[in-house]
């Protein structure tokens, strides 16, 4: 999920000059906004922008990282994803962070602001890059574990690049799905093959709740479709790994056949943030090929209670300190049983957006004020998240790496972590432990 609408809008507006320093008054986009209140707020926040631009961090592993987009089946029933992977050393350029202006229009719609705001955001943020080599050749000669990644509500495939790139730099292939369930702020497909051949995109935007809709019902339908999209993406990647000829509709420079015999088929996991965290649980309950799952600040509302007892695989909850609430934590607790591996940690001083790239593309002051940043340094937060994830993945995918050096993070043993949750559930029967043997004091 994205942050509260006004918070996100104000934060992005206030950071425009950080990305593209020009005379804002010369551009004068607020002249096109009818509401004087909006104009005044935007101008005031622009004046408050800090002078230093933040950047999305590079991966900390030993592998160079490549990036490409894959679309299989040109219709909106097909699979669309951004792939991060270990790459060969070459001179390919970095990857555009948000590659089409329509994604900014989708964000504008999600935020409930005029479409002009999408044009403004596109103008200033459209050239921001993320540190992965676009269409760089895959590093061959070994098989890689595979991660399927699910984005949050109002997000899309490209805005968790700090996680995808770091995992790829440690030797994973990461398939970041763009969901077609109506939860992405924007996505595109092609109406027919001829449209695909000439690149004539058809765009669809966030599905808004209609009057009379029950959110639980709508979100449950979406999370079921999302889980199927995760399995569908896995099917396609494994087909390519087997050597089945599958054409990338986008017809990019990246040769899909490079992926043949590149996947360690016994080492597959699913990770997701917020709505994507709920998708992790749904996917685990439906597809046993996912050996384990990591839910980042999961939003549990979309899930039926019935699935909690249908997840035998190891599951790791990594939460922020400021997003979670008792009802959400109680639902996580329903996944726990003595015979199942369950872990939970909370990153101290963190907010919901510490898991997404927005926390890196805004200045410190404004990012903090509008909850894109927490009290903890954004780089420290994502580093803890990624290292704890790597340790968990090594343990449950049987990897022969050195990620076990971070095993203590899984238990919340760091000055910036706490085991369990910071949420105080007063009924002792609702107390959530970090593991079946953990002491209750780990919760508080």
UniProtKB/Swiss-Prot annotation:
Catalyzed reaction equations: a 1-O-alkyl-2-acetyl-sn-glycero-3-phosphocholine + H2O = a 1-O-alkyl-sn-glycero-3-phosphocholine + acetate + H(+); 1-O-decyl-2-acetyl-sn-glycero-3-phosphocholine + H2O = 1-O-decyl-sn-glycero-3-phosphocholine + acetate + H(+); 1-O-dodecyl-2-acetyl-sn-glycero-3-phosphocholine + H2O = 1-O-dodecyl-sn-glycero-3-phosphocholine + acetate + H(+); 1-O-tetradecyl-2-acetyl-sn-glycero-3-phosphocholine + H2O = 1-O-tetradecyl-sn-glycero-3-phosphocholine + acetate + H(+)
Chain positions carrying an annotated carbohydrate: 60, 200, 424
Keyword Protein biosynthesis: no
Secretion signal, residue range per the UniProt entry: 1-21
Molecular function (Gene Ontology), one example: 1-alkyl-2-acetylglycerophosphocholine esterase activity
One Pfam family in the UniProt entry: PAF-AH_p_II
Keywords for the protein's UniProt record, in alphabetical order: Glycoprotein, HDL, Hydrolase, LDL, Lipid degradation, Lipid metabolism, Phospholipid degradation, Phospholipid metabolism, Secreted, Signal
EC number of this enzyme: 3.1.1.47
PTM entry text: N-glycosylated.
Tissue and organ expression note: Plasma.
Statement: the UniProt record of this protein carries the keyword Electron transport: no
Location(s) in or outside the cell: Secreted, Extracellular space
SUPFAM superfamilies associated with the record: alpha/beta-Hydrolases
Record-linked Gene3D superfamilies: alpha/beta hydrolase (3.40.50.1820)
GO BP, one annotated term: platelet activating factor metabolic process
Name of this protein: Platelet-activating factor acetylhydrolase
Source organism phylogeny: Eukaryota, Metazoa, Chordata, Craniata, Vertebrata
